[in-house]
Amino acid sequence: MMITLRKLPLAVAVAAGVMSAQAMAVDFHGYARSGIGWTGSGGEQQCFQVTGAQSKYRLGNECETYAELKLGQEVWKEGDKSFYFDTNVAYSVNQQNDWESTDPAFREANVQGKNLIEWLPGSTIWAGKRFYQRHDVHMIDFYYWDISGPGAGIENIDLGFGKLSLAATRSTEAGGSYTFSSQNIYDEVKDTANDVFDVRLAGLQTNPDGVLELGVDYGRANTTDGYKLADGASKDGWMFTAEHTQSMLKGYNKFVVQYATDAMTTQGKGQARGSDGSSSFTEELPDGTKINYANKVINNNGDMWRILDHGAISLGDKWDLMYVGMYQNIDWDNNLGTEWWTVGVRPMYKWTPIMSTLLEVGYDNVKSQQTGDRNNQYKITLAQQWQAGDSIWSRPAIRIFATYAKWDEKWGYIKDGDNISRYAAATNSGISTNSRGDSDEWTFGAQMEIWW
């Protein structure tokens, strides 16, 4: 009996410790990719993106080590009510050395409270920095609806026929035409706080296994007292989105139509900008002080249309497929817009449940509104892959690859500069008038990719 009494407090203590550890368990999620590559003509791996496009086909075409490390925890729960704390720190380096220092990006720090409002069961209120309901095309790493940033909102309000979400976020624009110049201190400039107000209605049943999501985003400059917008900067804009998702073939197809105006056209994903983001100009104030507005051309007034179809499906036990097709037209009053269309496929053949071969073929074509010239590029990658499962989404994965790219460009390339600016054909400013010409290249290497 004495032995039993001695063991009982110990057992209770151990059990309590285990239960406490479970209750306080920290969730660890994230994403990472890294590898090594070479270029056929010599040197480290090059990556290929057509000048003027906002993205590139990514398989065998990523030249950096990148990671997002997420730590989160449910810190309080009572019945169906709870608070969850979430964080995310991101890192990116050039993968050229053992020791590569970098400043981390603190991308998320937010608290989400579920079922806290009695008369809105199922809803979540939140505040802080957050990846907010992002919509993207994985195979080209393209985010077409993304208002992420510091903000607050309420989501998943059940209306019976769909779920309503409301949010406000901020995306500060530094050093450009949305920068204010002080009316009182002429040598002082200030970054611009651009606010976005987002309304989404999701889960609208349209057909068997098909749902519709509708969204409206309004972005504007939030001016600081005593400062003014640079002359010609776009003050605000709208973006409208309709996305239909069809569940099919053990996967999905998404069809998207978007329209944006003025400040919402530069990034085209729901965040406001007051400029087109390509050039630079210097303003000389009355006292002789010169202020350089770097990497911006003011006045992105105009509109943008985007039609997008993408998905991932299974074509039987041995085949999976990713695909994308998109047309985008940015028509600006300053004549520096672009017309971009892209199409690509990534079939996967599964030799075993953990080994596969992938082939990615992608084509981009971008027309300069100013010059009327076109840049085009196609990229082909063949990869042998070992992954944790038999799906095209299975990760972690280790792959060896060979990539071939061929391009023919006639506008907008800055040698040794930022060759992905879609507004680089600013011939009236005397910059960005060259092109990559007509050439090709191939690369090969190995890469790991993981999310968890």
UniProtKB/Swiss-Prot annotation:
SUPFAM superfamilies xref list: Porins
Keyword tRNA processing part of the UniProt annotation: no
UniProt record, GO biological process: monoatomic ion transport
Site (Greasy slide, important in sugar transport): 31, 66, 99, 252, 393, 451
Subunit structure: Homotrimer formed of three 18-stranded antiparallel beta-barrels, containing three independent channels.
Species whose genome carries this gene: Salmonella typhi
Known catalytic reactions: beta-maltose(in) = beta-maltose(out)
PANTHER family: CRYPTIC OUTER MEMBRANE PORIN BGLH-RELATED (PTHR38762:SF1)
Domain of life, per lineage: Bacteria
Disulfide bonds: 47-63
Transmembrane segments: 27-35, 65-78, 81-93, 105-115, 123-130, 149-159, 162-173, 192-205, 210-222, 235-248, 251-263, 301-315, 318-333, 337-351, 354-369, 373-388, 396-410, 437-451
Keyword Nucleotide-binding: no
Extracellular topological intervals: 36-64, 94-104, 131-148, 174-191, 223-234, 264-300, 334-336, 370-372, 411-436
Protein name per Swiss-Prot or TrEMBL: Maltoporin
Pfam family, one: LamB
Gene Ontology MF: a single term: maltodextrin transmembrane transporter activity
